[in-house]
Amino acid sequence: MADTVPTELIEFARHMAASHGLEPALVCAVIEQESSWNTWAVRYEPGFLARYVAPLYTAGKFSATEAYTRSMSWGLMQVMGQSARETGFAEPSLVELCDPPIGLEYGCRILARHIARAKGDVSAALLAWNGGATLNYAEIVLGRKRNYSSQPVK
């Protein structure tokens, strides 16, 4: 865990996790892996665009700008824009996902959905979260989870 992360941010993430029935240590580990606690982390995923978003754009469902922003991961948990839209995110700009309360709400909502679909198998849920791009992703995140497991939720 980075020593420079504000305690308030860690506590807020732990609170949001608990409010979604998630292990706070797991959400903190995902955040550390995905963004290193950078609230403004943004990454374009060209493979995601081609596979998931381009067919919707081609069908005229939304603009090119929306297509590209849906193909980006945003904020602390690196929530994919398309996943946020599918989960009910209706704000005009996906950059709002960089605001910790909003990004953590949608990130926790999506992660909880993956865990439910995987019938509680956290490793499988983490692979779904990551899109299977990194085969040892679950192992990495679960290793990071140990750094946060001994900290009680305040």
Where is each model-derived feature located?
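Catalytic glycan-binding domains that act on GlcNAc-containing polysaccharides
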Residues: 2-154
